[in-house]
Amino acid sequence: MSSKLLRLAVTATAALALVGAAPAMADRNPAPAHGGQDSFTIVGHRGASGYRPEHTLASYELAARMGADYVEPDLVTTKDGVLVARHEPEIGGTTDVAAHPEFAGRKTTKSLDGVTVTGWFTEDFTLAELKTLRAKERIPEVRQRNTIYDGRYEVPTFQEVINLVKRLSRELHREIGIYPETKHPTYFRKQGLALEPQLVRLLNRNGLNRSSAKVYVQSFEVTNLIELHRVLRVPLVQLTGATGAPFDLVDAGDPRTYADITSARGLRDVSKYAKGLGPDKNQVIPRDAAGFLTTPTTLVRDAHRAGLVVHPYTFRAENTFLPADFRSSAVASEYGDLFAEIEVFRAAGVDGLFTDNTDIAVAQEDLAA
């Protein structure tokens, strides 16, 4: 069977899993690589988070089996200095910690990058304590089907993610990459729990701190990427938001915003320490007040002129996340036309994307070939 047909077969199997026909089978079917260095890059955003609770080994594994080039773990730290995969340090929304009476006293209120947040925070738990918790779906109102997996998966360490990627690379006979993000580095550094030394140690220990490794390291902050540029041989990616500014710059009194960073001049500065740009997709093609796509900006062109690849985020199948152009109905949780959205952004020149729905992105690429 050809590579393309095999991958489409995997996509079809995954589609059956969505309607409950064969979820376990979808997890077992392998998918081959879909290109070399110049191919379109598909990043499994928090794994295959459209189908499994995010940042679980099950989610990462499903993304890899669906054909993702990379899986993306967001990294935070425990009280005892172990990197774990969670979208935020606050874990009330992504684990069952609220159901553990022994941890009721850990609930607290903190300032997270200038925002008041109440809940339970990874830095207040040892790894052993975190391992007693189980993950749950973060947005059950949109992804109700994912809730059948609530309570089944642990919070993984970054080392466990690396181990999984190595095992799957051997099993699937292709190299699967990792695309870790350092979450809130200034916040953790101020608590004496800097993320960067742990990240560098783990990449070194696993033989991944080399230019040929299939690794990107990303951050919404600037300072830690500049520091990592001095010690890492893997490419770095500057993440940007459609509004606001990097918190490290805000904290230092630096007036630069994400808009400044994504200007032609700002991108030239980014290219001094990074090889890629990870913008909000609305920075590539904005939406009007009604949610419809407008004209593409010059961001992709300017980034390419600065020598940067462009991997925007996040492409999701549900109507609530799609531009109005591609929604199928007013029901937030129903699928719209993610195929069409990806096609428009590929036509705008992006080099890859982050998606919760790896199977759809892979199928779109294969059908467009």
Give the location of each predicted region:
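Phosphate-group recognition and catalysis centered on beta-loop-alpha active-site segments
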Residues: S2-T11, L18-A369
